[in-house]
Regions:
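Conserved alpha/beta enzyme-core scaffold
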Residues: 1-123
Length: 123
């Protein structure tokens, strides 16, 4: 049975998100990010999230909002250079971080969508 992917608002879109989930968050830089859904996740207080995204936002915008409230336990990303809170949490060991090249990130996301168990890239 097909899933209805049309929702009325961010609250409805985030209803199925709970503690410990892995979320792939869209956008490039600060453009095209799901701002309303991120705000809703902050409001809901879900925690221990693993976030997969091109970037980590900035201190007061994008995924930076979830980092400020310490709702992210692991970040898988290719660029994180503009977020001071991210840097603080990473250096203190509060945040698990997996930095990967942008092309590898895109390929891993594509492979996951295809159900491929592995991809091979040069070392």
């Amino acid at each position: 049975m097909p899933i209805n992917k049309v929702v009325k608002n961010a609250e409805e879109a985030c209803n199925g998100i709970s503690d410990g989930m892995t979320l792939m968050v869209g956008g490039f830089g600060l453009c095209g990010i799901p701002e309303n859904c991120i705000t809703e996740l902050v409001r809901k207080g879900v925690k221990n999230l693993t976030c997969i995204s091109n970037n980590a936002g900035v201190d007061d915008f994008g995924l930076g909002l979830l980092l400020q409230t310490k709702q992210v336990k692991k970040m898988i990303s290719s660029y994180v250079g503009e977020n001071d809170e991210f840097e603080r949490q990473m250096l203190s060991g509060e945040l698990e971080v997996e930095l990967i090249p942008q092309g590898t990130l895109a390929t891993r996301c594509m492979a996951a969508g295809y159900g491929m168990p592995a991809i091979y890239t040069p070392a």
